[in-house]
Amino acid sequence: MGSSSFYRVLLLVGFCAPIFCMLSSNPYNQESSHLPSMKKNPASQVSPSNTRFSFLLYQRLAQENPGQNILFSPVSISTSLAMLSLGARSATKTQILRTLGFNFTWVSEPTIHMGFEYLVRSLNKCHQGRELRMGSVLFIRKELQLQATFLDRVKKLYGAKVFSEDFSNAATAQAQINSYVEKETKGKVVDVIQDLDSQTAMVLVNHIFFKANWTQPFSTANTNKSFPFLLSKGTTVHVPMMHQTESFAFGVDKELGCSILQMDYRGDAVAFFVLPGKGKMRQLEKSLSARRLRKWSRSLQKRWIKVFIPKFSISASYNLETILPKMGIRDAFNSNADFSGITKTHFLQVSKAAHKAVLDVSEEGTEAAAATTTKLIVRSRDTPSSIIAFKEPFLILLLDKNTESVLFLGKVENPRKM
C-alpha cells in the first residue's frame, strides 16, 4: 500500500466499570507498600493538569447534556489521549497535550509521559479492600507497519498490550474487541463497538474497573425501599435510600451554598458527595476547579452526622469526537491529522472517540475499624450534629489519595435512569 492510503483510528476512551461498596471479601491479601509523597513522585507532574481537565470536560458534558446523568473517568480519558500523543506530531501533538492542561514552559514532554507511567503503575498497585485495574490495549491492522519507537513507548510507559487484527473482516474484529472489553470490565460494559468498518487501522482501548468497600458500610436493614427523590425538572421518582449515623468528614461551602460529604473507601480512595442548594446546581458546576476541590478537602471537619444516600445504578456514553475538538483537540479528527509517529506508510486520523461508564452504589461492604488522626468532637450516636439527605440531584467524585487523581466524576440527576 502506498503513502496515500487512508485509514481510521478508533479511540475507545476509558470504558469504565466502577462498582462502589460491593465487595463482601477482600480480593487481595496484603496492603500495598507506602508510595512516595506527591512532592517526590512523577505523578505530581500530571495530577494537577488531570484535575483541571476533569472539570473542564465535566462542564462541557453538563452543558451539552442538560438534565441528564453525567459519568466518566477523567484519569482514564487523560491517559488514553496522552498515550495517543506519543504517535502524534506537529500541531496534532501540541493540541492534545495543551488540552490536557500541560504547559511546555513548565513541564517537558518526557516528564509528562514519565508521570503517566508512574500514575498507571500506582493505580494498578494492589490495595487491601479495593480492586482497581486500568489498562490499555491496541488492536492493530495486521498489514500496518508501525514505528518501532511508538510500540516500545506505549508498552513501556503505559503498559499497553498490542494485538494484530484483521479489520478486513469487520464483524469478526468487532466481536473480538467487544469480547475483550467485556471480559476486562467483568461483564459490566458490553457491545462497546457497533460500527466498525474495514477501513479501520487501529483501535485503542482504555478500560478501568473499580471495586471497593466503604470503611463504614450501610446496613441493608436500614434501607428505605421507596424514598422520594426530586428531579431537577420538578417531578419525583421513588428510589431505595440508604442511611446511617456515623462520624464523617463534612462541610458547607457558604460561597456556593453547597454541602460536601466525604466517605472513605478501604484502599486509599475517597468519595465526595456534593449537594447544591435549591436552584444552585448550575452555579456549582461552573465553579468546579482544582482549587475548589483543594479547598473542600482542607476544610471538612469530622462530626456525627445522619446520612441519606440513594442506592442506584447509572451509566453514560459519550461520543468524544464531537466534544474534544471544542476543547482544542481539532486536527486529530480531520485531514490535518499528523500521526506519523505511529506509521509513515499510511495517513491516519481519529474517526471516533467513544467513552462509556457504568456506576453501581449499594450498601454492601466489609466492615473495617475506623482509625483517624482528624480532630473529632465526641457526641452521642443518637444525637447527630447534622443531617444530610441526597434526595435531589448531586455530584459525586471518586479520588485516589496516593496520586491525587480524579478516578470518576459524575452527576446523579435521576438515580433510577440507567
UniProtKB/Swiss-Prot annotation:
GO CC field: extracellular space
Listed InterPro entries: Serpin_dom (IPR023796), Serpin_fam (IPR000215), Serpin_sf (IPR036186), Serpin_sf_1 (IPR042178), Serpin_sf_2 (IPR042185)
Keywords: Glycoprotein, Protease inhibitor, Secreted, Serine protease inhibitor, Signal
Pfam families assigned: Serpin
Superkingdom assignment: Eukaryota
Compartments where located: Secreted
Positions glycosylated per UniProt: 103, 213, 224
Single annotated GO MF: serine-type endopeptidase inhibitor activity
Signal peptide: 1-25
Family label: Belongs to the serpin family.
Protein name: Serpin A9
Organism encoding this protein: Mus musculus
